[in-house]
Amino acid sequence: MIKPFRGIMPKIHPDAFVSEFAYVVGDVEIGAGSSIWPGSVVRGDAGKVIIGKNTCVQDNSVVHSDDLGAVIGDNVVIGHRVVCHGDKIGNNCVLANGCIVNGGRTEIADNCVIAAGAVVLEKTKVPANSFVVGVPGVIKGQVTEEQLVRFKRNADLYVRLGQEYKKDGKLE
């Protein structure tokens, strides 16, 4: 479902895919090739949410922001059951299944991985190429070139899947 809030309708690129079982509301921009999957919620009611190109928000995830807004980069994989309340997520990041990124001036730089189940606390600044694990999240290493290639393949897969779903019609 795509709805306006306070008279502001989400702006969704024609090449993006939004499942009819997702909820996208308010001041939201979704870039080309991006996909929002069933059960996911993208709320631009407190602040603007910008989702870049070729980014996927997988099933049952929430993307929201406070009044500062949120910018999610290009080629980002937001896994299943993720709560993303972060202010800035860089390009080529993976927010793995079940992780939580709390808002309040939180920034994750390019090429980062937030591991499954990890919790990034508010006001955290995660430097580029970091691998974050645990509760609270701590940097446990650097993302390798091999991992970046694998993550890009995963992002590309979701671009293709989104296009197939658009072509084949609605999810039933």
Which stretches of residues belong to each language-model region?
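Glycine-rich hexapeptide-repeat left-handed beta-helix
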Residues: 1-11, 45, 53, 59-60, ...
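A positional/architectural concept
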Residues: 7, 11-65
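A conserved beta-turn-beta hairpin within the catalytic core of GNAT-like acetyltransferases
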Residues: 68-69
